[in-house]
UniProtKB/Swiss-Prot annotation:
The lineage of its organism: Eukaryota, Metazoa, Chordata, Craniata, Vertebrata. Keywords: Disulfide bond, EGF-like domain, Glycoprotein, Repeat, Secreted, Serine protease homolog, Signal, Sushi. This is Inactive serine protease PAMR1. Glycans are attached at residues 98, 318, 455, 616. Residues 130-238 form the CUB domain. Residues 237-274 form the EGF-like domain. Residues 1-21 form the signal peptide. It comes from Xenopus tropicalis. It is found in: Secreted.
Amino acid sequence: MALLVWSSLVVASLHLLGTAAYPSRSKYTVINENCPGAEWNIMCRDCCEYDQVECACPDGNQKVGYTIPCCRNEENECDSCLIHPGCSIFENCKSCNNGSWGGTLDDFYIKGSYCSECRMGWYGGDCMRCGEVIQAARGEIMLESYPFNARCEWSIQVAPGYTVELRFGMLSLEFDYMCQYDYLEVRDGDNVDAKILKRFCGNQRPLSLRSTGNSLHLLFQSDGSKNFDGFYVTFEEVTGCSSTPCFHDGTCIADKTGSYRCACLAGYTGRHCENVIEEKSCKDPGAPMNGYRKLPDGAGLSLANHIKVGFKIHYFCNNSYVLSGNQERACLQGAQWSGKQPVCIKACKEPKVADLVRQKVLPSLVQSRETPLHQLYSASFTKEKTDILPTKKPALPPGELPPGYQHLHTQLQYDCVSPFYRRTGSSRRTCLKTGKWSGRAPSCIPICGKLENFNITQLGEQRWPWQAALYRRSNGVKDASLRKGSWVLVCSGALLNERTVVMAAHCVTDLGKSSIIKVSDMKVVLGKFYRDDDREEKSQQHLHISAVIVNPNYDPILLDSDIAVIKLLDKARVSDYVQPVCLTLATEMITSPQEYTIVISGWKILSDPRAPGSKNETIRAGAIEPVDSLQCEQQYEENGISVSVTESMFCAKQEPRPSPSICPSETGGITTVLLPSPTSPEGSWHLIGLVSWGYDKSCRKDLYTGYTKVVTFKEWLEKNMK
C-alpha cells in the first residue's frame, strides 16, 4: 500500500527523467563500481545508495523487481536521482523480464525492457504504447485492459469511394453519463480535429456506425483512477449498398462518393423503396366488333376485368376487316387508357399494280341494281306505297383506313401510262364484302402491228418498227474491208415483245449445222432504218442477247422448221420507232391473197460502201403473192434444183406493182400482212413468214422464194415468249 502511495506522489515528476542533473566530483567521471551501472554515474553524488523494489507480474504473480538508485541531497538526505512510477509499469505486460536482485547491473528502468510480451493493443518494452495508422480494407482493434492516464489514437483509412463501418464486439470502460473519465471517442475523419460521431463508455455494446468518407479517427483516454477490461472493435470498408438498404427487391446503385440510390420495382417508391404504391388498374375495354385483342403475359386480367397499369393491349381484325385506329393501347398511371378504341372495318387491300399500269380511285358513287323483284313491286303496287329504291352503296363506316386499303364498294380504274401499250384485264375493279377485288388484275402490253399512215405506193419510205437487225462479229469473214471483231449485218427478224425476237434458224447457227453461235458474238439492233452502220440514228437500240432457242425440228439441210427465238438481255424500249408485230391465228390465214396486202422487208446483206448513194440506202420492201406448193416445186425443178416444200413452209413471188425495191435472195427478211383489227380502223400487221431459201443469184420477179410459215409455230413461239 505504501508503494502505491509513493508511486502517485512521484508521477508528477516524470519529466525530470531526461533533464535532472547534479554536480558530481571528478572521481565519478568514469564508471563507479558502487553504482548499478555506468548509466547512473552522471546522476550520482559522493555516495550512491540503492534500494530494491519488489513487484508482481500480472501473469501468474511472478515476482519481479528493479533497483532505484538514490543520492544524498543538499540536506544530506537520501533522495531519488530518478523518479519512477513503480509497479504500474508491469500492468500491461503479458509476461515480464526478471532482473538481478540487488545486483549492480539491475537496469530495467534505464533499458526500458520490463516486458517480454504485451497485452493486446499495447506495445513497447514497457507495454505502455498504443495506437497506430491502419490502411486496410478490414481489420480489428483491441485494447486489453488499460493503465491510468492512458491515451491512444488510431486512424483507419480505406480505399477512396468507400466508407468505414465500425462494429463493437466488447466495451468495458468506466461508466459516466457524460463519458468524461474513461472513454472511446470516434471522429468522422482521419485526425483529432474531425467531427465527433460518438463518445462511448460503460459496458453496454453500442450499435455499429459508419463514416461519411473513407476514414475514421479513434481516441481512447483514461484518467488516474479505476481501470477496466478495455474494448474490441472491427472495421470494414463498405459501399452504400453493402448493408442492402433497398427494400422490396429494389436494386442498390452505388456512386463514387460512397452514397447510393435505390432503383425500385413497379409499385414501390421512396429512398429505400419502402413505400408501397397503391396498385391501380384500367377496366378492360374489350375487343372491337369483328376483331379480337391480345394481352401480354402478366397483364393481370382480374375477375373484375381490370388490367394492371403499364400493360398494353394489341388489337387485330378478322379476315376481310381492317383495323382503323390505334393498334395498341396502354393502361396509364391515372387508370386511363391511351388513345381511342379502334374499330374493324370491311375493306380490301389494294391490289398490286403491274408496270406501266396507272391506277385511279374513283369517287364514291351510288351503284344501282334493279332486280326482277323491283319490277314486280313497281307493277303490282301504287307509286305512293312502293317508293322502292334500287340497291345502292351504303354509307362509308366511320374511321380512317391505314395506307394501302380501300373501303367496301370502292372502285379502281386502270389504264396504261403509254400510248404504245394496251391494257389487258379489267378496266375497273370493285372492293367486295369478301375482302377481295372483282375482275382480273390488269396489265399493259405493247400494242402490236401498229403502223400509221401506211401507203402501198411508198414502200421505200416506210419504217417498219418491228424490224430487227441481227449482227455477228466478223471473225472468219473473208472481206478485206472488215477488220477482225467488227460487227456485220447478217439477217432480219421481227420483234414479238419487249424481250423476244423471232429469226430464221439458219441466221443463228453455223452454216449447215444445228450448233448455235455464241450469244456474245451476236447482237440485235432495233429502230434501224438506214443500211449504213456508220449513220447514227437516235432511234436505234443496241441490245445484247441472253439466249437463243432453235426449234427442235430444225433441219439445217432441208431448212425445215427454219425458225428460232432470240431472248434479249434487256427490255426493248417501245416507242414510235420500236414496236412489236402481231402473230397470226390459224383461222386468220389468208385464203384469198389478192384481197390482202402482204409485204416483205429487209436490208441488203451485201452492200458496197463505195457505191454512190450507199450512205442513204434504207430498208427495202416489196409486195408478194403466195403460190401453190406444187407450182413452187415444179419451177425449181425446171431450173435444175430439187426442193421439198413442207407443211411448215410456203412459197411466194413478188408482185410487179408497186415496183419492188427488194430481192429476197439478197436481203432475207420478214413477211407481214395487214389484217382488219377490231381496235384500229387502220388494221394491224401480222407476221406470217421468214425468208428461208431461194435462188442464189437471180432476182427475177417471177421466181419463187421459200418462207418459214410462222403460223405453224404460233404455240411454240408463245411458249418461249414468256
